[in-house]
């Protein structure tokens, strides 16, 4: 199954972007190849840019406080697994404490490193990171892989508390919805949202369905158009009916 997610607020959009960047950074940093570490460093710069949003830190702290209050009220509920609940509450406390102790904006440790900022400046220029542009970077790429991995991990470590908070909030958000089986006649699906106020819409398709959903939504209406996918496929709406799962997620 393939999940397609559509955020309905800038806050959730930012969290999804960060989640994607964190996963991409890990994938590149775990490699031993120099070019993978080049990609990891570029991803690190993106992480810092997205995480530097002025209200991100305060938003996450407030959301963690809110979720802790909601979940704490479930203690003693016979329908809730107490061990799982306590694990989530402990994770919320750890992420909250870690974020609260972060000085200034997330990613400031990168901005204060002159070497990294010189690399970042050249990275903004197409083809601007050749060895004659940045000989010190060329030297770094030729250091032992273990040394580069250690430095990448050190540069990524200050994002740990933000990453944990993002994972908790998105995990709770995704778990808040119940999938509904739906059908898009001739590739189109439309639905009034009525009293729903989703923060995230998830569309789930079977792997073999050669279509992707194009989603548009506001607080009143949801429209999904399934279009042909694949490299070289003619762009257009599917003519057949599409079976899919639809999930509305709200915290």
Curated annotation (Swiss-Prot):
Protein's UniProt keywords contain Cytoplasm: yes
Pfam families found in the cross-reference section: ZapD
Top-level taxonomic group: Bacteria
GO cellular component, one term: cell division site
Subcellular localization(s) per the UniProt record: Cytoplasm
An individual GO BP term: division septum assembly
UniProt keyword list: Cell cycle, Cell division, Cytoplasm, Septation
InterPro entries: ZapD, ZapD_C, ZapD_sf
Recorded family membership: Belongs to the ZapD family.
Self-association and partners: Interacts with FtsZ.
Function: Cell division factor that enhances FtsZ-ring assembly. Directly interacts with FtsZ and promotes bundling of FtsZ protofilaments, with a reduction in FtsZ GTPase activity.
Protein name: Cell division protein ZapD
Species the sequence originates in: Thiobacillus denitrificans (strain ATCC 25259 / T1)
